[in-house]
């Protein structure tokens, strides 16, 4: 009701269920048409930047199962069935960012921001990729007015967060 004091924000929570291996899912539906061409290009760029990968991505396939929706990548060397858990995890996180971007673009007057919560963000990702992901999340948080919350046990990620706080503190002086 109007005046009840609650502010409504789109919210996405990425639980550890996102880490269930695709091979263990009973039923998988694939779709190559979920992303626009612009999103596909952005996904490829983000994927390789965050994972510090050089191999060109030939296609990106949306994978939907009972537990999750993610994006699998295929290259000239392997297809989406052989993606690492880190790639699968990253695909899910990027899809969440794209969901907020779609809301931002489709409802520019109504969209006020959103909340993205990620349980164990660092899971399945090596330290350098965790830091790259943090940089990308910071950029999207600013661009899309997102509050991003995550849990971690990664010392690399905690150090990167501390460095980021120090950098912001210096800018405010």
Task: Label every model-predicted segment.
Residues 12, 16-111:
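Extended helical coiled-coil dimerization/tether regions that scaffold
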Residues 1-9:
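Glycine-rich phosphate-binding loops of NTPases
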Residues 81-173:
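Switch/communication elements of ASCE P-loop NTPase nucleotide-binding domains
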Residues 2, 25, 38-42, 76, ...:
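Glutamate identity and glutamate-enriched acidic tracts
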């Amino acid at each position: 009701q109007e005046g009840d004091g609650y502010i409504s924000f789109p919210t996405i929570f990425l639980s550890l269920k996102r880490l269930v291996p695709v091979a263990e899912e009973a039923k998988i539906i694939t779709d190559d048409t979920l992303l626009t061409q612009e999103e596909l290009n952005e996904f490829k760029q983000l994927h390789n930047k965050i994972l510090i990968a050089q191999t060109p991505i030939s296609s990106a396939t949306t994978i939907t199962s009972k537990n999750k929706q993610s994006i699998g990548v295929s290259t000239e060397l392997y297809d989406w069935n052989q993606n690492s858990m880190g790639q699968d995890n990253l695909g899910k996180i990027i899809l969440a960012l794209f969901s907020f971007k779609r809301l931002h673009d489709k409802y520019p007057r109504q969209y006020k921001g959103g909340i993205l919560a990620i349980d164990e963000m660092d899971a399945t990702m090596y330290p350098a990729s965790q830091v790259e992901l943090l940089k990308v999340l910071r950029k999207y948080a600013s661009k899309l007015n997102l509050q991003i919350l995550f849990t971690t046990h990664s010392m690399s990620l905690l150090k990167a967060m501390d460095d980021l706080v120090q950098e912001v503190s210096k800018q405010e002086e």
